[in-house]
Amino acid sequence: MAKKGTRIVVTLECTESRSVPSSEKRSAGVSRYTTEKNRRNTTERLELKKFCPELNKMTIHREIK
């Protein structure tokens, strides 16, 4: 029998969108992406640099619970 999968789906949220006032953003809201990570290789929270359409620039996106 196959083992339980080690890959889980995680949500990444922009860290800068919350601190910027809505007058400086293109639209109201927070940028979020979904991706998969391997639980065995990456035990800590995932951080990736992704494009934030709200701020129209590349920002750090952190894994949220």
Curated annotation (Swiss-Prot):
The residues forming the signal peptide are: none
User: Which gene does this sequence derive from?
Assistant: rpmG
Family in the record: Belongs to the bacterial ribosomal protein bL33 family.
Stretch list, region Disordered: 17-40
Q: Which SUPFAM superfamilies match?
A: Zn-binding ribosomal proteins (SSF57829)
Q: Which UniProt keywords apply?
A: Ribonucleoprotein, Ribosomal protein
* A Gene Ontology molecular function term of the record: structural constituent of ribosome
InterPro entries in the cross-refs:
Ribosomal_bL33, Ribosomal_bL33_CS, Ribosomal_bL33_sf, Ribosomal_zn-bd
Q: Which GO terms describe its biological process?
A: translation
Matches recorded under Pfam families:
Ribosomal_L33
Superkingdom of source? Bacteria
Q: What is this protein called in UniProt?
A: Large ribosomal subunit protein bL33
PROSITE patterns the record matches = RIBOSOMAL_L33
Q: Which GO terms describe its cellular component?
A: cytoplasm; ribonucleoprotein complex; ribosome
